[in-house]
Design a protein with these regions (language model features):
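General small-molecule cofactor/ligand-binding pocket signal
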Residues: 31, 111-113, 182-184
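Conserved SAM/SAH cofactor-binding pocket of Class I
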Residues: 44-129
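Conserved beta-strand signature within the Rossmann-like core of class I S-adenosyl-L-methionine
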Residues: 154-161
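A short glycine-rich, Lys/Arg-flanked "PGG" loop and its adjoining helix->strand segment in the class I
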Residues: 141-153
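Core SAM-dependent methyltransferase catalytic element
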Residues: 186-214
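N-terminal auxiliary segments of SAM/dcSAM-dependent transferases
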Residues: 1-25, 34-35, 39, 213-214
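Glycine-rich phosphate-binding "P-loop"
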Residues: 126-139
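Conserved class I S-adenosyl-L-methionine
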Residues: 162-179
Length: 214
């Protein structure tokens, strides 16, 4: 198997490119490169999440889990300038691109870090993620099981997953794990899932959040 985008230090030769993210009132041109997720175009799942997720909170700590070169994180930062946006990934090339893209866009409220970074806060007011499905089901469950419990009591996590890559089974796993999990959007084979605490839940301690994040 060729090296995947969730490698910590991609060995692929550099092939710089760019992707445009165009939304109402917002136009971002983002630098991309080989060795990161979807370098040639804005991933359709990412686009669906951007189009269908509700507006983010104006303040607080917002998380893009598996940020890649930064499209979700930068939109969060632009839409919520009073918030701190945490862009998390294991891929150093992706993090460098996300940081450079944030600087180019003048978005000083983005922090690009690896999953084990000690500056990460203890909780989040929103999670957006196009998660790294290809790490495998067990690793994905471990990843989400470490980060979703860090949501504030009234907060939600929005995950976009292709149907043929397991969106329905992921929704069932979320429900079986004690989350209120519902589908908020579906288009062209992609599903946007919302994960919230059940009403009886109280905040639980997070698991090992140093696992793989794209």
């Amino acid at each position: 198997m060729s090296q995947q985008y969730f490698a910590g230090q991609p060995a692929a030769a550099h092939r710089p490119g760019s992707v445009h993210v165009i939304l109402p009132g917002l136009h971002l041109e983002l630098r991309t490169d080989s060795g990161v997720f979807s370098p040639g175009r804005l991933d359709p799942g990412t686009r669906l999440l951007l189009d269908k997720a509700p507006p983010p909170p104006e303040h607080g700590n917002l998380l893009d889990l598996g940020c890649g070169y930064g499209p979700l994180a930068l939109v969060l930062a632009a839409r919520s300038p009073g918030a701190c946006v945490w862009a998390v990934d294991v891929n150093r090339r992706a993090l460098d691109l996300a940081a450079a893209n944030a600087a180019t866009a003048g978005l000083a409220n983005v922090r690009c870090v690896t999953p084990g970074d000690k500056s990460l806060p203890g909780g989040f007011d929103l999670i957006w993620s196009n998660p790294p499905i290809r790490i495998g089901k067990s690793a994905l469950h471990q990843l989400l099981g470490g980060w979703l419990p860090l949501l504030a009591p009234e907060a939600a996590g929005y995950l976009v997953v292709q149907r043929n890559l397991g969106s329905d089974s992921l929704q069932r796993w979320l429900a079986d794990s004690g989350w209120t999990a519902d589908r908020v959007a579906a288009q062209a084979g992609y599903r946007v899932l919302r994960a919230r605490r059940t009403p009886a839940d109280s905040p639980a301690g997070g698991g090992d959040r140093a696992g793989a994040a794209r």
